[in-house]
């Protein structure tokens, strides 16, 4: 919900007048509040151990917590038709799936068929194989690969995105890989899913990235933790990342997926993180 500035100022003035004349605005309605995340999602990698043996139970519990969206990273040996029915049963949607780029290139027919059945909009590359990109020239080749694969993804009726880790905001030679990717990929074809924690962990400022590349980030991985040099992840809202400021400046974000790589109690993490985000105004 977007605040109407004129209505906000009028309400603020009326409330101030009431306080001045009566000492308290007895019975007055609350001031308009900021935006909230309408449909909070979660990356199922967070709960991968339990999901591998009880995906229906995981989806049921996430739905009870309040989640509306999930992002897959594999289907835990369930056929796409079963996944679709599980999601429908629990009032969930799965707008995105993490799929390895090599799998998209070598098994695209199956990838696209599963995505079509389940209802994915986004085919998101979660990372690159270790060691594949270490130099500026490597990243240029990756950018060309992204353009090529994204063209194929679009032709099948889906959208292509890349999820960052900390490597793309660390210098390769004298340049940042993210600058190469942004410069050399087609903005119509290639979008980005910012993992906020990994951006910070790599030394980047999410606000600066959003300002430098407006419109390129379409999804966020909402992950919290301590500042570098440590690599300690926390419940969302319990770390040091200022999500309120980031969300307020993140224009054009379509999906917000909570994630933690290895929480001690994944479902407790999911519940605590949902509670924080559901109360966050920005």
Q: Model regions: which residues?
A:
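N-terminal secretory signal peptides and thylakoid transit peptides that target proteins
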Residues: 1-16
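Active-site acidic/histidine proton-transfer and metal-coordination neighborhood
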Residues: 12, 69, 76, 93, ...
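C-terminal segment of N-terminal export signals and the immediately downstream linker at the start
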Residues: 23-52, 61
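Conserved, mostly hydrophobic/aromatic
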Residues: 42, 62, 70, 87, ...
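Active-site mouth loops of central-metabolism enzymes
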Residues: 43-53, 98-104, 136
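Short, acidic/polar
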Residues: 50-61, 105-114, 204-209
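Catalytic domains of carbohydrate-active enzymes, especially glycoside hydrolases
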Residues: 58-76
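Gly/Pro-rich active-site loop or hairpin
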Residues: 59-60, 68, 169-175, 198-255, ...
């Amino acid at each position: 919900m977007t605040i109407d500035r004129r209505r906000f100022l009028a309400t603020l003035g009326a409330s101030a007048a009431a306080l001045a004349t009566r000492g308290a605005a007895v019975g007055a309605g609350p001031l308009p509040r900021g935006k909230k995340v309408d449909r909070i999602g979660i990356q199922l990698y967070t709960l991968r151990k339990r999901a591998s043996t009880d995906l229906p139970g995981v989806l049921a519990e996430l739905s009870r917590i309040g989640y509306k969206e999930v992002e897959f990273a594999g289907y835990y040996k369930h056929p796409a038709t079963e996944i679709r029915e599980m999601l429908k049963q629990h009032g969930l949607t799965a707008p995105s799936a993490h799929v390895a780029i090599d799998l998209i290139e070598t098994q695209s027919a199956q990838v696209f068929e599963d995505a079509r059945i389940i209802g994915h909009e986004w085919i998101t590359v979660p990372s690159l194989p270790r060691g594949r990109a270490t130099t500026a020239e490597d990243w240029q080749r990756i950018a060309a690969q992204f353009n090529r694969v994204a063209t194929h993804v679009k032709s099948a009726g889906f959208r292509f995105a890349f999820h960052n880790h900390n490597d793309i905001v660390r210098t390769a030679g004298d340049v940042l890989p993210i600058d190469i990717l942004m410069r050399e990929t087609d903005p119509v074809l290639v979008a980005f899913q910012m993992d906020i924690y990994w951006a910070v962990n790599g030394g980047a400022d999410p606000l600066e990235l959003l300002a430098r590349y407006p419109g390129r980030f379409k999804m966020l991985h909402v992950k919290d933790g301590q500042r570098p040099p440590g690599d300690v992840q926390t419940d969302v809202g319990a770390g040091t990342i200022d999500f309120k400021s980031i969300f307020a400046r993140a224009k054009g974000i379509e999906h917000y997926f909570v994630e933690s790589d290895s929480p001690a109690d994944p479902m407790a993490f999911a519940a605590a993180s949902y509670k924080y985000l559901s109360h966050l105004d920005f």
